[in-house]
């Protein structure tokens, strides 16, 4: 069964980039269902392992925002409830020699990177941890240092056929072995995400192009763990008029847009086409929008997001509402209904 996932971190309110990722996953799955009639699944996974920054109110806001957008999910998971599973896999990888201990401090690692850059070399980790003797490790630990652990990348080409970017390939020799366990025993994003994708049967991963190098790393993790590698798609990131999406636009939350009177379908209709050559069409539901959605139509160029476009499109979306829907809203607000002549 085609299965996608959306994995927000409940460390703040959902912004326009988060909404776009969730929307593209929902539309991709629903388009596949429209074409084949086969069942699809959408997994909502809370990446809530950041114990200090993850808040219940932010998690609740994710549910509210997705429901407002009409984005439903079939399964809900929390990474904070799966820590034992991650530890189990880490222990297995240690036993197989695919994870090794390192003792550098953050300052020492930054010094290494600066030296490499000054010599015109890429800032790739030098695998010093692999060469440490047991005696040297004991010395470090006697100093009060605690190890972090890295996954051993194979120095070979990793390739995949991307749903948006086409053929992609990265050589593991040009990438640093990723940290998979921090000094305090917590887990960065990379390995738990792969474990979850395997355990939950994720078949397609659609996320921003800033994850492309992560994909090269994670494909090797899938292969080492014996999992089936999902299909990947990396749409380009949104930009503002001056290029990079400003902090103000990038952090624009759905609740702010809602407060401005923007319809959920206005956001959906714009984001589903922004970055494609397809014209923006007004649809009354995500199901209708999904019928003509094509992820492969997204280009490599980063699309420009301008909130003003939402305000231009919003009246068209409102006018597409049925009179019964409008009157139901007016009734909730204690306002008189409109008649057919007014709404025509």
Task: Please place each PLM-identified region on the residue numbering.
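Alpha-helix initiation and N-capping motif
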Residues: 59, 83, 106-109, 122, ...
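Active-site cores that bind ATP or allylic diphosphates and position pyrophosphate for catalysis
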Residues: 44, 101, 105-234, 239-245, ...
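Predominant activation on well-ordered alpha-helical scaffold segments within soluble catalytic domains
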Residues: 26, 203, 219, 265-268, ...
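N-terminal Rossmann-like or analogous alpha/beta NTP/dinucleotide-binding catalytic cores
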Residues: 1-119, 214-227
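Short helix-capping/linker segments at secondary-structure and domain boundaries
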Residues: 29-41, 200, 275-280, 319-323
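Short, histidine-centered active-site or binding-site loop motifs used for metal coordination
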Residues: 6-10, 46-48, 195, 199, ...
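Catalytic adenosine-cofactor/nucleotide-binding cores of aminoacyl-tRNA synthetases and other
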Residues: 225-344
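Catalytic cores of large soluble enzymes that bind and process phosphate-bearing ligands
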Residues: 54, 78-82, 101, 152-153, ...
């Amino acid at each position: 069964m085609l299965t996608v996932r959306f994995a927000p971190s409940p460390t703040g309110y959902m912004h326009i980039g988060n909404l776009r990722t969730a929307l593209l996953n929902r539309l991709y799955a629903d388009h596949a269902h429209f074409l084949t009639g086969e069942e699809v699944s959408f997994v909502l996974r809370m990446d809530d392992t950041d114990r200090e920054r993850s808040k219940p109110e932010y998690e609740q806001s994710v549910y509210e925002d997705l429901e407002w957008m009409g984005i439903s999910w079939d399964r809900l998971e929390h990474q904070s409830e799966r820590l034992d599973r991650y530890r189990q896999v880490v222990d297995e990888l240690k036993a197989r020699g695919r994870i090794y201990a390192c003792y550098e401090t953050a300052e020492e690692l930054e010094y290494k990177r600066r030296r490499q850059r000054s010599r015109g070399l890429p800032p790739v980790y030098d695998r010093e941890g692999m060469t440490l003797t047991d005696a040297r490790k004991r010395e470090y630990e006697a100093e009060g240092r605690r190890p972090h652990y890295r996954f051993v990348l194979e120095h070979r080409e990793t390739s995949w056929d991307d749903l948006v970017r086409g053929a992609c390939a990265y050589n593991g020799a040009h990438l640093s072995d990723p940290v998979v366990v921090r000094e305090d025993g917590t887990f960065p994003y990379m390995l738990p995400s792969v474990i979850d994708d395997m355990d939950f049967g994720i078949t397609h991963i659609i996320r921003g192009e800033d994850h492309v190098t992560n994909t090269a790393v994670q494909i090797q993790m899938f292969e080492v763990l014996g999992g089936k590698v999902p299909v990947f798609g990396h749409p380009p990131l949104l930009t503002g008029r001056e290029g990079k999406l400003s902090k103000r636009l990038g952090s624009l939350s759905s609740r702010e847009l809602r407060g401005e009177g923007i319809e959920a379908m206005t956001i959906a209709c714009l984001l589903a086409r922004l970055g494609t050559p397809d014209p923006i069409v007004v649809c009354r539901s995500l199901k209708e929008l999904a019928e003509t959605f094509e992820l492969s139509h997204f280009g490599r160029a980063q699309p420009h997001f301008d909130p003003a476009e939402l305000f231009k499109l919003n009246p068209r979306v409102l006018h597409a509402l049925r009179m019964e829907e409008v009157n139901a809203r007016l009734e909730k607000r204690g306002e008189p209904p409109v008649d057919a002549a007014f709404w025509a």
